[in-house]
C-alpha cells in the first residue's frame, strides 16, 4: 500500500504540470489584479448566497492497488432536480479517460496530510472520501464546456444564467479553486470581444479575455456579472513561462454556454 501512496503523490505532481501547461499561451502583458475587490459586487454575492453554487472537481484513477487523484478543477451549479445538481465546467477538467469524477462543495472538510520527507502536503483520504461521485452528461462540440451531474443531500444554491454576453469593460467576479485556495474570489473586467482560444491545447473555444486573477485549479469556474448572473465559464488563463505571473484570463460567454445547453437538451443521451 505504501508504494500505491507514493504513486498517488507522483501522479498528483505530474497532473499539476500537465494542467499548468494548458494555461501557457505565450502572450505578453501582465494584468495581475488579485488584490482588486469590488465591494458592491462582494456584498451582492454574499447577500445572494451564491458561494454554495460553486463546486470543485477532482478525477480519481484506480490502477490495481494504486489510487491517484488529478489536479483540481472548478464548476458552478446551474440547475437542480431534487437532490440531483447539474453543473457547468470546462471539458478538459473532466476529460481523463477511465477516471471517476469527485465533486466537493463549500461544506466539504478539506483535510490535508504531509508527505514524509518533503515540505509538501496533499488532501487526506478522508477528504476525498467525503466528496460526491459525479458523471459527465455532455461535452460541447464547440467549446471547452461540459455538463456534469452529482447527487447531494445538502442544500446548495443555483446560479441564474445571464441573457446576454458581457461587454468590454464590464465588471466581473470569478470563483474557483486556484492553487488549492478553495472557493477563492477574484475581480476584474472583460478586456476583449470574442476571440478563438485553446486550439493548440486541443480544446478550442470562442471566448473573451478578462483581468480577474485565475490560476491552475480555476478551470471550469464561474464568471459572474454585476447582476449576480453567470456570464461565463473560465477554461484557463495566460501565464508567464514559469507559471507565476498572471497575464489575462479567458471566459466562454453565455451565448456559447446556451448553445452547449441547447445541444445537450437535444442530444439522445440526455436523461
Which residues fall in each region the model found?
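Bacterial N-terminal signal peptides that target proteins for export
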Residues: 2-13
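C-terminal motif of bacterial Sec signal peptides marking the signal peptidase cleavage site
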Residues: 23-26
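C-terminal cap/linker of serine protease catalytic domains
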Residues: 31-33, 37-44, 106, 110-121, ...
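A conserved glycine-rich beta-strand in the N-terminal activation segment of trypsin-fold
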Residues: 38-41, 58-90, 132, 185, ...
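Active-site substrate-binding loop(s) of clan PA
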Residues: 42-44, 76-77, 135-137, 150-182
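Active-site region of chymotrypsin-like
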Residues: 51, 55-65, 151-157, 184-264
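Catalytic-histidine neighborhood of serine endopeptidases
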Residues: 80-141, 247
Amino acid at each position: 500500500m505504501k508504494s500505491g501512496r507514493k504513486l498517488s503523490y507522483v501522479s498528483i505532481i505530474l497532473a499539476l504540470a500537465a494542467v499548468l501547461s494548458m494555461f501557457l499561451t505565450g502572450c505578453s502583458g501582465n494584468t495581475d489584479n488579485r488584490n482588486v475587490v469590488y465591494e458592491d459586487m462582494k456584498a451582492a454575492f454574499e447577500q445572494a448566497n451564491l458561494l454554495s453554487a460553486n463546486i470543485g472537481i477532482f478525477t480519481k484513477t484506480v490502477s490495481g492497488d494504486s489510487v491517484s487523484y488529478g489536479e483540481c478543477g472548478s464548476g458552478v451549479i446551474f440547475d437542480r432536480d431534487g437532490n440531483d445538481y447539474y453543473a457547468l465546467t470546462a471539458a478538459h477538467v473532466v476529460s481523463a479517460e477511465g477516471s471517476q469524477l469527485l465533486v466537493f462543495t463549500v461544506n466539504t472538510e478539506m483535510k490535508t496530510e504531509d508527505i514524509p520527507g518533503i515540505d509538501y502536503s496533499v488532501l487526506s483520504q478522508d477528504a476525498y472520501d467525503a466528496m460526491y461521485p459525479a458523471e459527465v452528461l455532455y461535452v460541447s462540440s464547440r467549446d471547452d464546456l461540459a455538463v456534469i451531474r452529482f447527487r447531494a443531500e445538502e442544500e446548495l444554491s443555483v446560479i441564474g444564467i445571464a441573457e446576454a454576453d458581457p461587454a468590454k469593460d464590464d465588471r466581473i467576479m470569478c470563483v474557483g479553486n486556484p492553487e488549492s485556495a478553495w472557493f477563492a474570489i477574484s475581480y476584474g473586467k472583460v478586456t476583449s470581444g470574442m476571440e478563438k482560444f485553446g486550439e493548440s491545447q486541443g480544446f478550442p473555444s470562442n471566448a473573451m479575455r478578462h483581468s480577474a486573477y485565475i490560476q491552475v485549479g480555476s478551470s471550469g469556474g464561474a464568471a459572474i456579472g454585476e447582476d449576480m448572473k453567470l456570464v461565463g465559464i473560465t477554461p484557463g488563463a495566460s501565464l508567464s513561462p514559469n507559471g507565476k505571473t498572471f497575464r489575462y484570463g479567458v471566459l466562454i460567454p453565455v451565448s456559447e454556454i446556451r448553445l452547449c445547453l441547447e445541444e445537450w437538451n437535444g442530444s439522445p443521451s440526455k436523461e
